[in-house]
Structure formats: structure tokens, C-alpha cells
Design a protein with these regions (language model features):
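Catalytic alpha-helical scaffold of carbohydrate-active enzymes acting on polysaccharides/glycoconjugates
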Residues: 1-137, 143-165
Length: 165
């Protein structure tokens, strides 16, 4: 039997933030686009008896609050699926309504060791604050991981990295 890992990056889309959309619209368009978002995916996983890992990026909570992350984490866990950590660092300087004018570097590889430790630890804290178990797996946004990322993950106790395309 062939084994596969079903993984789903779960994040708010930067392009909707840049377009200046309100948070409810950003959440809807990012997480439930065209009727095939998280709810549909969870229904299909349930229908076929499959398990998946949802890599959730909590960083937009720095801009839009934690409520939407709590809803995502709750829905995924209630469906018996797994939540792990995803991270797009550009959100650390974003501000609601700024049309994308304020942002940090988009790729994790553009941060040094200490900055990566701080970003990953902070994102992990946000995710657990939203109700997720302590994450043991990680996926960098844009799959942009470096040797520093792998070392930072090991230092922080992560067991798996999925930053590979």
C-alpha cells in the first residue's frame, strides 16, 4: 500500500489584505473560496475516512485578531484532523487597512537565526492560544526554509519540517 500525506496550507491571503477588504471578507475568500474551502475539505475527508494535516498560519492574527484562527482550529480539531504550524512572516508589520503598505520580509530565509527563533516561537504561541495542541510539525510560507530554520525548529522542539516542495 502506498502512503501519502494530505497536507493543507491554511492561511489568510495577502492579496485580499492588499485589496483593502474587511476582515470578514478576507476570511471568507481565503478559507472558504468558491465553496471548496475548509468546510468542504473537512466534509470530503470525513466522507472518505481520510486524515489530513492542516498547516495553519496564525500570523495574520497580529493584524485581525485571533477569533478567525480559533474558528479554524476548532473546526479542524472537531473534525478529528490535525493542526500544525505554518508561518508567513510578512504579517508581522502589516496593519489593517494599510493596503499592504507595511510588511516585513516575506521569506523566512531572509531572517537570521535569532529572528527565526522569535518568529517561530511567537507563531507557535499564537496557534496554541487559538486552541491548537503544541505543534510538532512546521511548514514555512512559500516553502522558504534554510538550515537556520531547521536548527531553530530543532531548538524549539519541533520534530518535523514540511517546508519542501
Amino acid at each position: 500500500m502506498t502512503r501519502v500525506f494530505l497536507t493543507i496550507d491554511t492561511e489568510l491571503m495577502w492579496r485580499h489584505h492588499v485589496a483593502g477588504l474587511d476582515v470578514d471578507t478576507i476570511v471568507a475568500r481565503s478559507l472558504e473560496p468558491a465553496g471548496v474551502g475548509i468546510a468542504w475539505q473537512l466534509a470530503q475527508l470525513r466522507r472518505y475516512g481520510l486524515k489530513a494535516c492542516f498547516f495553519v498560519d496564525p500570523m495574520p492574527a497580529l493584524v485581525y485578531g485571533l477569533d478567525w484562527v480559533k474558528r479554524v482550529v476548532g473546526a479542524v480539531l472537531e473534525a478529528g484532523q490535525e493542526v500544525q504550524l505554518h508561518l508567513h512572516p510578512n504579517w508581522t508589520r502589516a496593519k489593517a487597512g494599510d493596503g499592504g503598505a507595511n510588511y516585513a520580509a516575506f521569506e523566512l530565509i531572509d531572517y537570521d537565526w535569532d529572528e527565526q527563533i522569535e518568529l517561530i516561537a511567537g507563531a507557535s504561541d499564537l496557534l496554541t492560544s487559538a486552541g491548537a495542541p503544541e505543534p510538532v510539525a512546521f511548514r514555512a510560507g512559500s516553502y522558504a526554509a534554510s538550515d537556520d530554520t531547521l536548527g531553530a525548529l530543532a531548538e524549539l522542539g519541533f520534530l518535523y519540517d514540511s517546508s519542501h516542495n
